[in-house]
Amino acid sequence: ACYFSSIDVYSIYNNAILKSKKNTISNIVGLSLGLSLQFIIAHNKYNPIYLSIPIIITTFIPFLVRFISFHKMKIVKQTTVNKKIKYNRYILSSGLSIVFSSLSIAIYTRINQFMISYLDGEYSLGIYSVAIILSSSWAFVLTSLISSTLPSIFGEKDDNRAIKIGIKLNIIIIVISLFVLSFILLFGEFFINLLFGEKYIPAYSLLKILCISTMFANLGTLSARFIIRSSGYSFLSKKMFIMVLLSIPISYYLIKSYGLIGAAYSVLIIEFLSLTLMNYFFKNKIIWKLHIATLKMNFK
């Protein structure tokens, strides 16, 4: 599943040419098939190893759809060797910081799982994993929205105009997240029982908290794009390294003291710090300005 996600450059291409609708549709198809298979496997009590199939399908189907769609298009001109070398150098120099930042994110989001397994046992880890899966299953909608607006944000030379676009997107992210949270509050317990069984009902209390964490994470993604827009690659990599270091004591203390609820709250705290305080040290305080303007709903 991770392999298909990592080689899926076609989603980036669709976002760049303002056709993120293709990404959204293919993601919905993949997610629907994945969840349907999960339900069939859980309902019929098949060997849990079969749950790896829907996980793979969730990323493979969108990749396959985008791959076929891309190769049906007529790609125009070939670039010269010199331009390719120059472009590859630029990708390498600017991309290494982003790679390090992404690795840091992957590490600090997994720290909780290691600590739950160590401090609370495998059953608790299973409950937490279910909550994580469901709380992030809808995030592709927000990711598509963010990606589709990136060209307009990166293409805008004036910071104030870029911030106005960011304000609107922040509000859309918050509204969609609150709608999903309301749905989870009403039907979350029912769907956990339907998809995973009665033993995983305790995941419901975690799901509500982790859903808010998902909102913060996506608001943080938008803020990170503003930082990249200002060439803050080095800042991002340093920030995420600090977040990894911070997440270890926070996760350990909360999990040891409060168990699974503590684990969920540790994610919430880390995502909130990453979104707010840690971003406010960036030059010109552009993220601070973005957040204050969002709270005031200042579109002027």
Language model features with spans:
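Interfacial segments at transmembrane-helix termini and the short loops linking adjacent helices
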Residues: 122-124, 186-215, 261
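Helix-terminus/linker motif at the lipid-water interface of multi-pass membrane proteins
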Residues: 42, 103-137, 192-198
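Alpha-helical transmembrane segments of polytopic membrane transporters and translocases
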Residues: 60, 97, 112-114, 124-142, ...
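Interfacial/gating helices of multi-pass transporter permease domains
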Residues: 48-49, 53, 86-98, 116-136, ...
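Hydrophobic alpha-helical transmembrane segments
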Residues: 24-73, 132, 242, 260-283
